[in-house]
């Protein structure tokens, strides 16, 4: 068997070299310590377009709250979103829950064991189906994500780069697959792309399969991604709530994003208000943050505001709600809202570090979801 420009012997040698490297160097990640297809499914959905470091912060708590597929299926959407908060791309969480409900209702509560059947579930495409099937069930089907696409394009010397070669890679990856350890081999290919065969400045001298690569050492540094910028302003509105046990609890006003919003639909955040060109009539913001989502930097200012200063009810159809601080952890908040509330010391039990008053554009912290 040969794979493109590789002979049958080279394919066997490449597999062996890659697996030896992976066994010695793979990262110790919680979803690699389990053979539970459900846990692997959750991890793969979280890892879509999200850094491993960000997933690690949420995976353990999500699995602790939803340890089984049945638990997830029986939980409200808002609670699932609350435990997803900070990961972004919230449609993934909605589809994950929807798919869990489908499996319980139509599959007897058992996740299908083949990539073909997995693709019929909401939110599961070719990549995710192959990952679950190979890692969770041992099906010999190749995974092709961005990392594998880049590795295969360089390894085979395919012309035109990853985008142009995308149609050729799945078949090549399938022929290269180690059928004895398909799940580990797929993870090894992805690990190689994540740690060694980087988009810019690939570490060719450290690559375990460099002798088989047709483009080793030829890669130029990719230009820096151009980021767009947008300013956004939020109101921090507080009031003393009803008397309880002799104390009046502080309540915060939250606003729900529209269900048809392109980002974070249906999530809760602090009310958005028009930008204050002169610092809200002389007031300085309580907090300023830079918040990066995909290719846009959002420069967010948070001003203390009275409820009477907000116009109307936030526009037609806008839903607002007063909540106590103790209710915040169970709310499906946007990642920016959750982190801002912690920085503002409004999160229950969170003292945080001292937050200086910042002038717009100065001393900005970066928050990436």
Residue ranges and their predicted role:
Residues 1-28, 33, 194-369:
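Intrinsically disordered, low-complexity, charged terminal extensions of DNA damage-control enzymes
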């Amino acid at each position: 068997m040969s794979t493109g420009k590789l002979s049958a012997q080279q394919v066997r040698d490449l597999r062996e070299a890659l697996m030896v490297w992976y066994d010695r160097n793979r990262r110790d990640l919680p979803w690699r310590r389990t053979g539970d297809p459900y846990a692997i499914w959750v991890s793969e959905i979280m890892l879509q377009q999200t850094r491993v470091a960000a997933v690690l912060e949420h995976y353990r708590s999500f699995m602790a709250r939803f340890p089984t597929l049945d638990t997830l299926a029986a939980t409200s959407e808002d609670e699932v979103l609350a435990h997803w908060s900070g990961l972004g791309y919230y449609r993934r969480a909605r589809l994950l829950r929807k798919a869990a409900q489908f499996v319980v209702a139509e599959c007897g509560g058992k996740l299908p064991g083949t990539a073909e059947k997995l693709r019929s579930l909401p939110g599961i495409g070719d990549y995710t189906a192959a990952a679950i099937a190979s890692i969770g069930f041992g099906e010999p089907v190749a995974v092709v994500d961005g990392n594998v696409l880049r590795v295969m394009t360089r390894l085979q010397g395919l012309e035109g780069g990853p985008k142009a070669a995308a149609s050729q890679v799945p078949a090549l990856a399938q022929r290269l697959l180690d059928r004895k350890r398909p799940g580990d081999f797929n993870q090894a290919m992805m690990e190689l792309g994540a740690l060694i065969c980087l988009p810019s400045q690939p570490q060719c001298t450290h690559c375990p399969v460099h002798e088989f690569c047709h483009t080793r050492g030829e890669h130029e540094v990719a230009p820096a991604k151009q980021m767009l910028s947008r300013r956004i302003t939020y109101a921090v509105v507080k009031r003393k709530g009803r008397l309880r046990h002799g104390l009046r609890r502080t309540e915060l006003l939250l606003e729900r994003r529209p269900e048809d919003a392109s980002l974070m639909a249906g999530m809760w955040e602090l009310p958005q208000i028009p930008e204050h060109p002169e610092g809200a009539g002389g007031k300085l913001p309580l907090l300023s943050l830079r918040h990066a989502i995909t290719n846009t930097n959002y420069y967010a200012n948070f001003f203390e505001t009275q409820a009477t200063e907000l116009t109307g009810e936030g526009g037609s159809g806008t839903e607002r709600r007063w909540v106590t601080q103790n209710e915040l952890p169970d709310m499906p908040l946007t990642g920016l809202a959750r982190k801002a509330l912690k920085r503002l010391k409004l999160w229950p039990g969170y003292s945080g570090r001292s937050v200086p008053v910042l002038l717009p554009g100065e001393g900005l912290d970066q928050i990436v979801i």
